[in-house]
Design a protein with these regions (language model features):
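Eukaryotic N-terminal targeting leaders
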Residues: 1-2
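Eukaryotic assembly scaffold/adaptor repeat-domain signature, activating on surface loops/turns
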Residues: 9-43, 55-83, 96-131, 138-181, ...
C-alpha cells in the first residue's frame, strides 16, 4: 500500500526561516492526531520530515548553518543535520531549557534554563561544555523570586556581549569580562499606570514580568516587552529608561491617569494580552528602524492585529539630548496596523528578509509569516500588511494550515489538459528557493489526480497529488470564491466539482449559492468589481468579479443564489451541464451554453409520483421527513424502454430515492430536462456509478460519449447505486435490478475502480476501518485491506476514491494521505 502525505500532522507550534539557504522549518505539537515533528520546506515540492527522538512537542526551533536546533517539551535538545537529513545528537541537560540562541559563526549554542543559568553546548563535539553563566539576577537581587531565562540575544555588532532576558528583568553580560555589565529592572512606582488593565493595581508598586528582550539593530538601545503589555526602551550604557509605553499610551512608568480598556459591562475592564513577540526591524540602513509587536492588545477586541512602529532614522546617540531620544520612541514617524483575521491572535511571527540574515533576521524584511493561537498561519507583505497568498509562494503542505481546509475533493484530469492549466498571476519574489527535488518515475499515460481544497477564507486551491511519481506541473491554481460571491464573510464551501476536460469548476456554499468558474483570459485585469446584489433564484453574471492580479486562470462565470439551504450535492459534467441539490430539497440543472437554468424543482415533487404507485405502507412520520439530494451523476446510456441513448442525470436522495432525468437538445441549440422516473432504495444514497452492462466500464457523460450520440451510438448501460447499507444494480429509470446488502458495517463512500487489466470492481470504505472490493455484477467480496491506521475513520465520508484505486482521505485537521490499495503487499 503506497502512502503519500500532504499537510501538517498536528498543530503548528514553531516557525523558523533561514534566508541564506532559503528554507523554512515548521515544528508541531504532540496531539491525538500525531507526534510532534519538524518539517523543512524548500522550493516547489521539496520537503523533509524530521521525527523527534521521543514523543514530544516542539518548543524552540532555530537554524544554525547546516544544522537545525530544536528544544522539545521533554527537555531534549536535538541537533539535526540538514545535509544528511538525520538526527546528529539529542541531549537532555540537567535543568529545563527555556531559551536557545545560536549563531552560524559560532560552534556553540547557548541554552537558557529554568533555574536562571546559561549553559553552552558544543555543536561540533556534541556535548555540554564546562562554561556556564550563573543566575546573574539572583546574585544582584538575592530576595527575588525564582527567575528563569526567557530570551537570549547576542549584541548585533559585538559577539562578546550577551543580552539575557530573565522573567524578572534583563541583564547585559560580557564574555570578555565574565561579569554582568548592566541590569534593567522595570519597576512601576505607585500611581504609574504601566500597561495594566486593572485600575486597582495602579496604587501599589509592581514589577511586571518580562516576556521579550531585543537589541536595537545597531545595539544602541535595548527593548523589553512585559506581561502587562508594556514596551520599555533602555539605554544600555547607564541602564536608564528612555521611554516606557504601550501600544496606545506613552510614559506609562510615571504617575498619571493612564487609560484602561472598558469591558463588556459597565464598571468592568478588559484584560490585555502580554507582549508575545517583538522584532526590531531595520531597512538597508540599520539606523532606519521600526518595531513590530505581536500582542499587547485588549482581549475583548475581535481583530488582534500586529502593530508596527515606524521610527525612521535613529538619532545620533552621542549628540542627541535625552528629550530627543525619548520623543523618538514616544512619537513614531508612522504607526501601521497589520490586520489579522477576526477572532484570531498572533502568538509568534517569523520575518522574511530580502537578502541577508543579519540583525537577527530583521534587516530589510519583505514579508512576515504569523502563527495564530489556533495553529494556523497567515502571511503578509511588510511593512504594508497586505495579505500574501501562500499559493506557489509557500510549500503545498503549509497551505493546508493557511487557513485550515473545510472541504476536499479529487478529480482525475487527462495529463496534457493539466499540463496546459498554468495560471498567470502577478506575484512578488519567491522566498523559498532552497533544496533539490528528488527524482521519481514518470507515468505519462496516467490521468493526474487533481485535488481541490476549499479553505476557511473562501479560497479554493487545485494541485496535482500525483501517483507517487514525477509531478510535471507542480504549480497550484487558486480561486477566490469570496470575491466571486461578492462578500468576505459567510463563504464556507460545502461541495466542489471539477470538470477537467472542460476546464470548468463549480463550488457550492453553505449559504446556498453555486458559483461556476471557467478557464480563460481575464479581461478585467487590475479592475475592482462594482458592488451589486446577487439575483435570488436566478443566474447572475459575475465575469467582472475576477481577481485583479490574475491574467489567465479559472475565472468567475455565473452564480446561482438559490437561498434554499446549504448545497448538499453538486456535479459539474464535462459536457456543459451543472446539477446542484440543496438542503431545502430543491434541484437545479444549469446549461452553461446560455448559461441558463433548464430545470428547477423540488425532490418532493417527483418522489410523490413514486409513492402514489407504491404498494408499501408509509407512515405519516416518514412522509414528513425532509428530503434533499445527496448524490448527482451524469451518464450516457439507453433507458429501459428506449431505442436510443441520451444524456441522463441521476439524482440520489438522503431517504434512498434515485430519480432519473433525460436531457434532450432543442432546435435552437439549447437543452431541456425532463423527469423520467424514480426508484426507491433502502437508505441514504452515497454514490451513483453508471456502467456498461457487459464490461463494467464507467458510462459517464464524457465528451466522447456525447459526441457519439450524433452518430446514433447506443450504450447498453446500468446504474450502480450505493447506499450506506447496500448497493443495487438496475436499468434506469425504474427497473428493480439486483441488490446487495452490507453485512455488518455501513459504507461511507464508494466508486467503480479498475485494477490494471483484471477488470472493474466496486471499492468502498466501511465503518470498521477497512476498504473492501466487490465484483461486478455478482457483488461478491474480492478482498479487503485495513486503512484505519492511515486514515481517520470518522472522516471516511469525506474521503475520495479514484478510478485507479487511489484513496485521498484525512489523517488530521491539516493533513491528508493519498494511498493506493492495489498491490501484492511485498516491499521491493
Amino acid at each position: 500500500m503506497e502512502i503519500k502525505n500532504f499537510g501538517i500532522n498536528s498543530q503548528i507550534s514553531q516557525i523558523a526561516y533561514d534566508p541564506v539557504q532559503s528554507l523554512l522549518a515548521v515544528g508541531t505539537n504532540e496531539s491525538k492526531y500525531g507526534p510532534g515533528q519538524i518539517y523543512v520546506f524548500g522550493r516547489k515540492r521539496v520537503e523533509i520530515v524530521l521525527p523527534l527522538p521521543h514523543p514530544a512537542s516542539v518548543k524552540i526551533l532555530q537554524f544554525c548553518a547546516e544544522k537545525l536546533l530544536c528544544v522539545d517539551s521533554r527537555n531534549d535538545f536535538s541537533v539535526f543535520s540538514l545535509e544528511t537529513k538525520r538526527l546528529l545528537n539529542a541531549h537532555s541537560p540537567p535543568a529545563k531549557i527555556t531559551a536557545l540562541h545560536s549563531d552560524p559563526t559560532l560552534d556553540y549554542a547557548l541554552l537558557g534554563t529554568g533555574n536562571g543559568e546559561v549553559l553552552a553546548y558544543d555543536l561540533d563535539r556534541e556535548q555540554l561544555t564546562q562554561f556556564r553563566i550563573p543566575n546573574l539576577w539572583r546574585e544582584q537581587f538575592p530576595r527575588s523570586r525564582l527567575t528563569s531565562v526567557v530570551t537570549l540575544s547576542l549584541h548585533p555588532r559585538d559577539i562578546g556581549s550577551l543580552l539575557i532576558g530573565y522573567n524578572a528583568g534583563a541583564v547585559i553580560y560580557s564574555f570578555k569580562q565574565n561579569k554582568a555589565l548592566k541590569f534593567f529592572d522595570y519597576v512601576l512606582p505607585k500611581g504609574a499606570p504601566g500597561g495594566d488593565s486593572d485600575p486597582a493595581s495602579v496604587f501599589k508598586e509592581r514589577s511586571p514580568p518580562l516576556t521579550q528582550a531585543v537589541w536595537h539593530p545597531t545595539g544602541t538601545f535595548i527593548l523589553t516587552g512585559h506581561e502587562d503589555s508594556s514596551l520599555v526602551v533602555w539605554d544600555p550604557k547607564d541602564g536608564r529608561i528612555i521611554q516606557a509605553r504601550t501600544l496606545q499610551d506613552t510614559n506609562v512608568d510615571k504617575p498619571g491617569p493612564g487609560t484602561f480598556s472598558p469591558g463588556a459591562n459597565p464598571g468592568t475592564f478588559a484584560l490585555k494580552s502580554p507582549i508575545f513577540k517583538i522584532a526590531w526591524c531595520a531597512n538597508e540602513d540599520p539606523d532606519d528602524t521600526g518595531i513590530l509587536v505581536a500582542g499587547g492588545q485588549p482581549s475583548n477586541i475581535a481583530a488582534k492585529s500586529l502593530t508596527f512602529f515606524e521610527l525612521g532614522r535613529t538619532p545620533v546617540y552621542s549628540t542627541s539630548s535625552w528629550q530627543v531620544l525619548s520623543s523618538h520612541f514616544e512619537d513614531p514617524k508612522r504607526l501601521r496596523i497589520l490586520p489579522c483575521p477576526p477572532g484570531t491572535e498572533v502568538v509568534d511571527l517569523c520575518l522574511i528578509p530580502r537578502t541577508n540574515p543579519h540583525f537577527a533576521g530583521c534587516q530589510d524584511p519583505i514579508a512576515v509569516i504569523a502563527l495564530l493561537a489556533s495553529g494556523e498561519l497567515i502571511s503578509m507583505s511588510f511593512p504594508s500588511g497586505m495579505p500574501i497568498t501562500p499559493t506557489n509562494q509557500l510549500h503545498l503542505s503549509m497551505t493546508l494550515a493557511h487557513p485550515y481546509v473545510n472541504h476536499l475533493h479529487l478529480a482525475p484530469v487527462e495529463r496534457t489538459r493539466w499540463l496546459g492549466m498554468t495560471e498567470k498571476r502577478q506575484q512578488g519574489p519567491k522566498f523559498l528557493n532552497g533544496g533539490l527535488e528528488a527524482n521519481y518515475p514518470l507515468k505519462r499515460f496516467e490521468h493526474r489526480n487533481i485535488v481541490q481544497m476549499s479553505h476557511a477564507d473562501g479560497t479554493v486551491r487545485l494541485w496535482d497529488a500525483g501517483h507517487h511519481d514525477e509531478i510535471e506541473n507542480d504549480a497550484l491554481l487558486q480561486i477566490d470564491v469570496a470575491r466571486a460571491v461578492g462578500r468576505q464573510d459567510n463563504v464556507e464551501v460545502t461541495k466542489i466539482s471539477f470538470a477537467g476536460a472542460a476546464s470548468e469548476l463549480s463550488a457550492g456554499l453553505r449559504s446556498g449559492e453555486v458559483v461556476v468558474f471557467r478557464w480563460g483570459i481575464n479581461k478585467h485585469l487590475g479592475q475592482e468589481p462594482i458592488p451589486r446584489e446577487n439575483e435570488q433564484g436566478a443566474l447572475t453574471n459575475i465575469v467582472d468579479r475576477s481577481e485583479a492580479d490574475l491574467k489567465e486562470g479559472l475565472l468567475p462565470l455565473t452564480l446561482l443564489a438559490e437561498g434554499n439551504g446549504p448545497v448538499t450535492a453538486l456535479k459539474h459534467s464535462d459536457v456543459g451541464f451543472v446539477a446542484a441539490g440543496f438542503e431545502g430539497g430543491s434541484l437545479a440543472i444549469i446549461d452553461l451554453r446560455g448559461p441558463a437554468i433548464i430545470y428547477h424543482s423540488n425532490v418532493g415533487e417527483f418522489v410523490k409520483s413514486e409513492k402514489r404507485g407504491s404498494f408499501r405502507r408509509s407512515s405519516t412520520q416518514s412522509a414528513s421527513k425532509a428530503e434533499w439530494p445527496t448524490s448527482l451523476e451524469f451518464s450516457v446510456m439507453t433507458l429501459d424502454g428506449d431505442d436510443y441513448s441520451s444524456i441522463l442525470l441521476h439524482v440520489g436522495t438522503n431517504l434512498g430515492h434515485v430519480a432519473t432525468f433525460k436531457l434532450l437538445p432543442e432546435a435552437g441549440g439549447r437543452y431541456t430536462a425532463s423527469y423520467v422516473g424514480v426508484l426507491s432504495l433502502d437508505d441514504k444514497v452515497i454514490s451513483l456509478c453508471p456502467i456498461y452492462a457487459d464490461t463494467g466500464r464507467p458510462a459517464y457523460a464524457s465528451q466522447a460519449a456525447v459526441a457519439g450520440l450524433r452518430n446514433g451510438s447506443k450504450i447498453n448501460g446500468v446504474l450502480l447505486a450505493v447506499t450506506s447499507s447496500g448497493a443495487r444494480i438496475f436499468k434506469p429509470a425504474t427497473n428493480k435490478g439486483a441488490q446487495k446488502t452490507w453485512d455488518q458495517f455501513l459504507c461511507d463512500t464508494a466508486t467503480i475502480v479498475r485494477y490494471e487489466e483484471l477488470g472493474y470492481a466496486l471499492l468502498g470504505l466501511y465503518g470498521d476501518g477497512y476498504a473492501r472490493g466487490y465484483s461486478i455484477p455478482a457483488m461478491k467480496e474480492i478482498g479487503s485491506v485495513k486503512v484505519s491506521d492511515v486514515l481517520d475513520v470518522r472522516r471516511f465520508s469525506e474521503a475520495v476514491i479514484t478510478s485507479t484505486g487511489d484513496i485521498l482521505g484525512w489523517k488530521g485537521p491539516a493533513e491528508t494521505a493519498l494511498i493506493n490499495i492495489f498491490g501484492t503487499n511485498l516491499k521491493l
